């Protein structure tokens, strides 16, 4: 039995990863600034620590840990990342967490780290055409992310790779593309497009507002495929970043239509000004396929069915709780 540490275990992906690692038979320690909002953690130990504080990281990382999965970050959807109001917090908070973890790994002799980067680190000039975005791994430079969130992710990629070169860390890095599924943020201002649109459709009486023209495109990776990819990349010999996302691209208006079909509702789309991000983003999976012999499957419909059902249930419970309060 190996001892695993999941930083960010109180978050959406981290919570699912803890469960998966336990199912594999590992002893799992979870850490986060908050408890998971929607489930009781499956971790053997959970520490509610602010990982920006070096003293907390010093207590958390011990020499008997086999692998650290570093998912902890200051993050959110377009309404959080692209307004500009949170740029300093995003840069400072996430950078401090990664600097603390990398330094303490060296001090304690812990070698293995898995870092979740993001497709947000890709240059904005390669994502202006909604029909033909360029997001192959080698297109990352010259660097020009469209947000401070993306710049920090790029910095931390280089941080872990430099610690691998100079201090012997075994770093594995995945650039995640719009991961979605149950048990994630859906109504707190940090939710991403699939969850936000599932909520809007579920609450709709005929019309919903969608930020931007709706022709902007994205690909979306269901959480089960994300967790599978994390395990496969971590077990591989690949020491450079790999895309982890779906190659199926869909417009935001198209995503609304797909969710509406799943919900069996007729919904009119009202496109309004709002935080937008790039016009086109889609995973390019040739390198991950060539490197580890695997790439995510297209589970968009299935994933949206599961996510919509979960969010609808959450809405119903919130209404019921409000009536009995």
Name the predicted role of every residue range.
Residues 42-54:
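Rossmann-fold cofactor-recognition segment
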Residues 148, 152:
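Active-site helix of classical SDR
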Residues 51-93, 124:
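NAD(P)H-binding glycine-rich loop region in Rossmannoid oxidoreductase-like domains
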Residues 99-146, 172:
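Conserved Rossmann-fold NAD(P)-dependent oxidoreductase catalytic core, especially the SDR/UDP-sugar
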Residues 125-134, 158-234, 247-249, 257-262:
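NAD(P)-dependent short-chain dehydrogenase/reductase
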Residues 20, 203-325:
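C-terminal substrate-binding subdomain of Rossmann-fold SDR/epimerase-dehydratase oxidoreductases
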Residues 26-35:
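Conserved glycine-rich Rossmann-like NAD(P)H-binding loop of the short-chain dehydrogenase/reductase
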Residues 4-24:
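N-terminal Rossmann NAD(P)H-binding glycine-rich loop of SDR-like oxidoreductase domains
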């Amino acid at each position: 039995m190996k001892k695993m540490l999941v930083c960010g275990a109180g978050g959406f992906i981290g919570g699912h990863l803890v469960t998966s690692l336990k199912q594999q038979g590992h002893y799992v320690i979870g850490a986060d600034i908050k408890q998971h909002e929607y489930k009781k953690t499956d971790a053997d130990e959970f520490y509610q620590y602010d990982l920006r504080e070096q003293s907390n990281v010093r207590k958390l990382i011990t020499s008997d840990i086999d692998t650290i999965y570093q998912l902890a970050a200051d993050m959110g959807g377009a309404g959080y990342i692209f307004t500009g109001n949170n740029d300093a917090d995003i840069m400072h908070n996430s950078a401090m967490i990664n600097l603390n973890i990398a330094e303490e790994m060296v001090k304690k002799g812990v070698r293995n780290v898995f870092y979740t980067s993001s497709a947000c680190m890709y240059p904005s000039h390669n994502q202006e055409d909604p029909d033909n975005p360029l997001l192959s791994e080698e297109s990352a430079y010259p660097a020009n992310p469209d947000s401070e969130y993306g710049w920090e992710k790029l910095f931390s990629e280089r941080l872990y790779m430099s610690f691998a070169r100079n201090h012997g860390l075994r770093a594995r890095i995945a650039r995640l593309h719009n991961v979605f599924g149950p048990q994630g943020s859906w109504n707190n201002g940090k939710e991403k497009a699939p969850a936000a649109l599932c909520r809007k459709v579920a609450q709709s009486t005929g019309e919903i507002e969608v930020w931007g023209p709706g022709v902007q495109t994205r690909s979306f990776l269901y959480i089960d495929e994300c967790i599978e990819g994390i395990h496969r990349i971590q077990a591989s010999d690949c020491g450079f970043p790999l895309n982890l996302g779906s190659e199926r691209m869909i417009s935001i208006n198209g995503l609304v239509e797909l969710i509406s079909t799943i919900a069996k509702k007729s919904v009119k789309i009202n496109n309004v000004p709002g935080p937008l991000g790039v016009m086109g983003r889609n995973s390019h999976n040739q390198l991950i396929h060539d490197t580890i012999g695997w790439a995510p499957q297209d589970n968009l419909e299935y994933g949206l069915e599961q996510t919509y059902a979960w969010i609808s249930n959450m809405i119903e419970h919130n209404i019921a709780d409000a009536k009995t309060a």
